[in-house]
């Protein structure tokens, strides 16, 4: 079959520059062996995150020029609200500056409404900031991911699913009154950008509602999840992405969204409620205090204009096929070279199994982070660790939590890089593989108490 190229023309370019090996080592040492602390100008191909790093369309840039910067009642908010109601069916819409802004104003209110004395949040897998906001609210985050996701070589289609048996047992053991919310993360980032099946979402929603537990959808990559449902579930093969999205969101009571992913914008988030006017109003109070007035939530009007357009563009099936195909292509290149990855590839990134590639480095020396550093030194490619460093310590004991995965995430920004860039990344990682046994683990030089992977400084063991 003829290969289909990117479904867009490029109207603007940004120069990037290569660096020497000596320059990269100096930059990494200055950054405390933490790719997060590298200067962007020292990075050749940046696969740190897909959050806010994508390219906007000409229509979005046109929307930027039509920004209404009224403090209250901006017409851009009205358009965003109309778009959310149409696409997701949620009546009460609150913009936030990004996803974590939505979490910080919602989670404390869910805790306040929890009838039990020991509230917990249960998810297929909380991402780092989600877990942090649960802990900042004084509560515990419990991950109940399907065990099928733990075998990175198994070609299971729905590695983002909940373990339904454990979910049932956990609710019964802890008591439904102690569950502040069940959070369905779509797609499941920490498991490898893996999708959650519609059947699993339906079962989780039914179980939660039977116990009167709120269902929150962490919707950062909702469109990619919908694409996988269409591609992998025969029952939805003839459904449109829009129809699948609407059915997914029918299963939640509220959603938080970092719109910097599938919203195709550089900044923005959403905190939305299907009904729940009383909860919505309580969260509004926090929004005013922490994010900004309820019709802008920390965003400029022009950013809301771009988001209203981006939500629709992000659901375009042709775009999604290209997007997920680009991820799959990089995964195929690596797998063909014998580099272990989470299979099948997910929606936004290729996840390299550092535990298998670097078996000589124990979890407490952060093998995936060590691999990220080695990849940067090889070719100026910046990736990020999803493993023990990100997971952190048990807040009760202070001991390092045991990570299910030690993964290097190669996160592909939307509409930014071409296949040639992917080939370069693959070539660099293949070169790293040839000297994998020489890579050393890392230990802390400075360890922050929370979300340590962002600002920690490390050194080779």
From Swiss-Prot:
An annotated Gene Ontology molecular function: tryptophanase activity
N6-(pyridoxal phosphate)lysine sites (modified residues): 261
Pfam families: Beta_elim_lyase
Entry cofactors: pyridoxal 5'-phosphate
Domain of life: Bacteria
Class of this enzyme: lyase
Keywords: Lyase, Pyridoxal phosphate, Tryptophan catabolism
InterPro entries linked to this entry: ArAA_b-elim_lyase/Thr_aldolase, Beta-eliminating_lyase, PyrdxlP-dep_Trfase, PyrdxlP-dep_Trfase_major, PyrdxlP-dep_Trfase_small, TNase
E.C. number(s) listed in UniProt: 4.1.99.1
Biological or metabolic pathway of the protein: Amino-acid degradation; L-tryptophan degradation via pyruvate pathway; indole and pyruvate from L-tryptophan: step 1/1
Signal peptide positions (record): none
Catalysed reactions, semicolon-separated: L-tryptophan + H2O = indole + pyruvate + NH4(+)
Annotated protein name in UniProt: Tryptophanase
